[in-house]
Amino acid sequence: VKGPFPADGFFGQGFESKFDAVLGMYHDQVLVPFKSLAMGSGTNFTAGLDIVRTSPDHGTAMHLAGKGKADATSMRNALYTAIDVHHARQAYDEMTKDPLKKQKEKS
């Protein structure tokens, strides 16, 4: 974990390529650089919810609906990410369902 970094300098100098993931505290802080770098293949993930919420980076793309021109890559990535997060949460729940009971230390 590194940072924080100012968004304009971070993306402007290509630092994002040195990391596996970039976390922004605000939606608009990283949306423009994210879309410019990953348009057509990126996935938005909203953390901290009880449900898994992902979406393709292009949003609804209603201007392409019914025209046979949309690229499904970003939608597929969003679905696969949602499935991966769901499975990871299931695995975590399974691993932590029966924790060891705390023992009192002998004095």
Residue ranges and their predicted role:
Residues 1-104:
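Glycine-rich phosphate/nucleotide-binding loop
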